[in-house]
Every structure is written in structure tokens, then in C-alpha cells.
């Protein structure tokens, strides 16, 4: 059985959590009232929502709604759960709480996480894949993949007027404005530009290098 939490899902704002969860359990085929009551208490407790069961869903915070979404995804004891952008828009406290919840669930259920937030991958995933245009480009353990880029990532500040030419002649992983200049990260076996320093690779480097189709042959 498959459980699914989409990035955006509708909740009836004037219905309380207990009522909607019971309704969803019925829709998923749990017809026995006693079984539904036990399941509802178990899953709402697991997601730390039991004490809020009588509150209307329209009063829930973004993180509480996400936790309710995970609870409903667990109805029916699924063996696989797909979670789409679960921490998008959450504040740091709720993101941390949600990470802990997913880690706990992942001990007993296979969780497939679809996300653009690199912290989700580094904190939660034992295995990862980077997909572009429907094709899997990279797959493996996050830390092992990052380790392959050790000594390959360089960083430095350049003038904005020089950036275009540098990007043309070097494998620029990513760039951002900093103090009126451009802070760039470059993929190279050797010091690409005088004054650049070697830096520890991050998952974000792997992601941008893959998406930007930089030459990773021999590195990954």
C-alpha cells in the first residue's frame, strides 16, 4: 500500500482534525469504528497532534498541517510513502520537528522524498538521486557522493565585469552577489583562478553541477 503527501493539499478549515481524520480513514476502507478510533489516536499522537484533535484545521500552522498530512498518509499501514516538498515554507522550528518525524517514520517505512531543499537530503536521506528532464543523472549515498568531489571545489570573489568570461572558461557550479562582487564556486582539479581557495564540497555543489551539466566524469 502506498501513502502520499503532496506539496499542497486541501484541508476543510471549519472541520476539526478528529472529524476529518475519521472521514479519511473511512475513505481508505477502515469501516470498523473501533479500529478507526484506535488508529486515529495512534497516528495523531505519533505526529504530536492528539492534543489538538478538536481544533479546527483552519487554525493549524503550516507545520501542523504538514504533520496532519503525514498522519493521513500513514493510514492503512503503507510500506512506501512519497513525500513531496515536505518542508517548503516551514519555519526552522517546524522544519526540525518535521525532520525528526520523518526520520522516525523512516525506521519502519520506505520514505521517498522529493525536494529542492538540500538540508532535507543531508539530514534525512540514506540514498539520493538527482533527476533532470525525467532522467536519473546521479544516484548514491549523499556523503559518499560528496566525498568524491573532495579537492575538486574551489571558491573565490571576482569582479562582476569578469564573471561572464570566467563562466565561459571555467566550470562554475554556482554564484551569488557578495559585497558588490560575485562569489563563485568552481569545479576543477587544480586552482582555476589565482587567489581561489579549495573548499569542502556540499550537496548543493553536486546538485548544481549535475543540473548545469558540468563534467563530472571521473569524479562521480
Region locations from a protein language model:
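Conserved ABC ATPase "signature" region
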Residues: 22, 26, 34-52
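Q-loop/switch helix immediately C-terminal to the Walker
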Residues: 8, 14-27
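Conserved ABC ATPase signature
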Residues: 56-60
Amino acid at each position: 500500500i502506498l501513502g502520499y503527501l503532496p506539496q499542497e493539499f486541501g484541508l476543510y478549515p471549519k472541520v476539526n482534525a478528529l472529524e476529518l481524520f475519521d472521514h479519511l480513514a473511512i475513505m481508505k476502507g477502515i469501516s470498523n469504528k473501533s479500529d478507526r478510533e484506535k488508529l486515529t489516536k495512534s497516528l495523531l499522537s505519533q505526529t504530536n497532534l492528539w492534543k489538538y484533535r478538536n481544533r479546527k484545521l483552519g487554525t493549524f500552522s503550516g507545520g501542523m498541517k504538514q504533520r496532519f498530512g503525514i498522519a493521513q498518509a500513514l493510514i492503512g499501514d503503507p510500506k512506501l510513502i512519497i513525500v513531496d516538498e515536505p518542508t517548503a515554507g516551514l519555519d526552522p522550528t517546524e522544519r526540525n520537528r518535521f525532520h525528526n518525524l520523518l526520520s522516525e517514520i523512516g525506521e519502519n517505512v520506505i520514505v521517498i522524498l522529493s525536494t529542492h531543499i538540500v538540508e532535507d537530503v543531508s539530514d534525512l536521506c540514506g540514498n539520493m538521486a538527482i533527476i533532470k528532464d525525467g532522467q536519473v543523472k546521479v544516484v548514491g549515498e549523499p556523503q559518499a557522493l560528496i566525498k568524491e568531489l573532495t579537492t575538486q571545489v574551489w571558491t573565490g570573489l571576482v569582479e562582476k565585469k569578469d564573471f561572464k568570461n570566467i563562466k565561459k572558461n571555467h566550470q562554475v557550479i554556482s554564484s551569488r552577489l557578495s559585497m558588490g562582487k560575485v562569489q563563485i564556486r568552481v569545479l576543477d582539479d587544480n586552482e582555476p583562478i589565482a587567489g581561489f581557495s579549495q573548499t569542502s564540497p556540499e550537496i548543493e555543489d553536486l546538485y548544481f553541477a549535475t543540473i548545469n551539466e558540468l563534467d563530472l566524469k571521473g569524479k562521480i
